[in-house]
């Protein structure tokens, strides 16, 4: 059976921090599913279709990465792909508290599911989608925080 990991997120928009985690985690799996979440509760700046397109553009050089859109329980998506490992990033202590709860919740729904946590590299530790959204909302230049393939798409927002 193929070793498959899932890296879920809203990716509103995808950042260099996300791509760093995709790069490092894709080396651990035969296949990495990047699951772009619907996340209507977060009121995303970009539509699910736009976010999926951005992620596909940003990850096109990764041969073992597949991008999918999803709505619903992550534990169910993991079962659908026969995946036993979720990939998550941790930047700050508050991320850990939230991710720990989510990891336990996912484990309670799918007992085979483990969560693998990645710390960001130093140059990406401060980057978040919310920082990027704030910069572009105020007409600032966020090109150094996002993959070059998607900057033209987000700078129009």
UniProtKB/Swiss-Prot annotation:
SUPFAM superfamilies: Nucleotidylyl transferase (SSF52374)
Record-listed ATP binding positions: 10-11, 18, 89-91, 99, 124-130
Top-rank taxon, per record: Bacteria
Entry keyword Transferase: yes
Pathway(s) this gene product operates in, as recorded in its UniProt entry: Cofactor biosynthesis; coenzyme A biosynthesis; CoA from (R)-pantothenate: step 4/5
Binding site for substrate: 10, 42, 74, 88
EC class of the enzyme, as a word: transferase
Entry annotated with the keyword Zinc-finger: no
Keywords per UniProt: ATP-binding, Coenzyme A biosynthesis, Cytoplasm, Magnesium, Nucleotide-binding, Nucleotidyltransferase, Transferase
Gene Ontology molecular function, alphabetical: ATP binding; pantetheine-phosphate adenylyltransferase activity
Site entry (Transition state stabilizer), positions: 18
Catalysed reactions, semicolon-separated: (R)-4'-phosphopantetheine + ATP + H(+) = 3'-dephospho-CoA + diphosphate
Compartments, record wording: Cytoplasm
GO cellular component terms, A-Z: cytoplasm
Cofactor dependence: Mg(2+)
Family recorded in the similarity comment: Belongs to the bacterial CoaD family.
Function as written in the Swiss-Prot or TrEMBL entry: Reversibly transfers an adenylyl group from ATP to 4'-phosphopantetheine, yielding dephospho-CoA (dPCoA) and pyrophosphate.
Subunit description: Homohexamer.
Listed name of the protein: Phosphopantetheine adenylyltransferase
Species the sequence originates in: Helicobacter pylori (strain G27)
């Amino acid at each position: 059976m193929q070793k498959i990991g899932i890296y879920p997120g809203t990716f509103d928009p995808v950042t260099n921090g996300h791509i760093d985690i995709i790069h490092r985690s894709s080396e651990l799996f035969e296949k990495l599913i990047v699951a772009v979440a619907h996340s209507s509760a977060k009121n995303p700046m970009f539509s699910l279709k736009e976010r999926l397109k951005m992620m596909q553009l940003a990850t096109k050089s990764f041969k073992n990465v597949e991008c999918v859109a999803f709505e619903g329980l992550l534990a169910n998506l993991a079962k659908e792909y026969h995946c036993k490992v979720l990939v998550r990033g941790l930047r700050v202590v508050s991320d850990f508290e939230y991710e720990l709860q989510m990891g336990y919740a996912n484990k309670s729904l799918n007992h085979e599911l483990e969560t693998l946590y990645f710390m960001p590299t130093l140059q990406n530790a401060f980057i978040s989608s919310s920082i990027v959204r704030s910069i572009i909302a105020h007409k600032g230049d966020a090109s150094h925080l996002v993959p070059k393939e998607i900057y033209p798409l987000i700078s129009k927002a």
